[in-house]
Amino acid sequence: MKAFSPVRSVRKSSLTEHSLGIARSKTPVDDPMSLLYNMNDCYSKLKELVPSIPQNKKVSKMEILQHVIDYILDLQLALDSHPSIVSLHHARVGGSTSRTPLTALNTDISILSLQAAELSAEFTDESKSLCP
C-alpha cells in the first residue's frame, strides 16, 4: 500500500497562482496601491481647485475636505443671496412649479409597489386554484 500526503505540492500551487495572476488584468479594486494613488490625485486636484487652501503648505486630507465643505457652503450662500436668483425664486414660488416634488413621486411609487404586490398575490392564488 502506498502512503500519500494530503498536503499539495508547493511548486504546483504557486505556478497556478502565478499563471492566473498574469492572465487576469488588475482593476483598481484588485490593486489597493492603484486606488490609493487615484485618491491622492483627487485630493491634489481638490487642493488646486479650492482657493482657500494654501498651495505652498502641506495640509492633511481632513483639512482639504473641511476647506471643500466650507467652500461649497460659501458658494451656496453667494448663490442664494444673488439678486437675480432671489427674484427668480420669488417668481417661481408665486407661479406654478415646473417639476414635481420628490415626496409626491415617492408616494406614487409606494402606491404602485403595493398595487403590484396585491396583483401578484391574486395571480398566485388563482394559479393555485387552477392547478390541483
From Swiss-Prot:
The keyword Repressor applies. One of its GO terms (biological process) is positive regulation of blood pressure. One of its GO terms (cellular component) is protein-containing complex. CDD domains: bHLH_dnHLH_ID2. A motif (Nuclear export signal) lies at residues 105-114. Its main location: cytoplasm. Residues 23-75 form the bHLH domain. One of its GO terms (molecular function) is protein dimerization activity. Coiled coil: none annotated. Transcriptional regulator (lacking a basic DNA binding domain) which negatively regulates the basic helix-loop-helix (bHLH) transcription factors by forming heterodimers and inhibiting their DNA binding and transcriptional activity. Inhibits the activity of both neurogenic (neurod1/neuroD) and myogenic (myod1/myoD) bHLH factors. May play a role in the regulation of the circadian clock. This is DNA-binding protein inhibitor ID-2. It comes from Xenopus tropicalis (Western clawed frog).
